[in-house]
From Swiss-Prot:
Natural source organism: Pseudomonas aeruginosa (strain ATCC 15692 / DSM 22644 / CIP 104116 / JCM 14847 / LMG 12228 / 1C / PRS 101 / PAO1)
Superkingdom field: Bacteria
Entry similarity comment: Belongs to the universal ribosomal protein uL15 family.
Gene responsible for this protein: rplO
Sorted UniProt keywords: Ribonucleoprotein, Ribosomal protein, RNA-binding, rRNA-binding
Disulfide links within the chain: none
Function noted in UniProt: Binds to the 23S rRNA.
Region ranges (Disordered): 1-57
Coiled-coil blocks: none
Name of the protein this chain belongs to: Large ribosomal subunit protein uL15
Recorded GO CC terms: cytosolic large ribosomal subunit
PROSITE patterns, sorted: RIBOSOMAL_L15
Residue stretches of biased makeup (Gly residues): 21-31
One GO BP: translation
Amino acid sequence: MQLNDLRSAPGARREKHRPGRGIGSGLGKTGGRGHKGLTSRSGGKVAPGFEGGQQPLHRRLPKFGFVSLKAMDRAEVRTSELAKVEGDVVSLQTLKDANLINQHVQRVKVMLSGEVGRAVTLKGIAATKGARAAIEAAGGKFED
């Protein structure tokens, strides 16, 4: 027996449906679409979310929330990520150069998460109380 001699057992695989190929197939003439109506036509399908004229769910439910524009230009940085910045001074530009924040970010806040590996000077960057204490304990300082 060779690989090219292998065959599925008889009855193991069903033949695919071929709509519109004779009445003996069970899907002849109308091809399983029924008679007339929207879904019998080519391209005939209702839009997603359409509920037959009933007010759709997305219009029955109330609006809620909003997108804060402040979130667009603010970012958070962990204390453990400060080690990725080259040099001893950490500023907005050095964080962007290290790919820790996006280019459009204008304000950054340092959060306490992980170890502060070395003494760094933070210029124009805010920090939480815990992060500030950890950075100062490692010999770092803050400048405005």
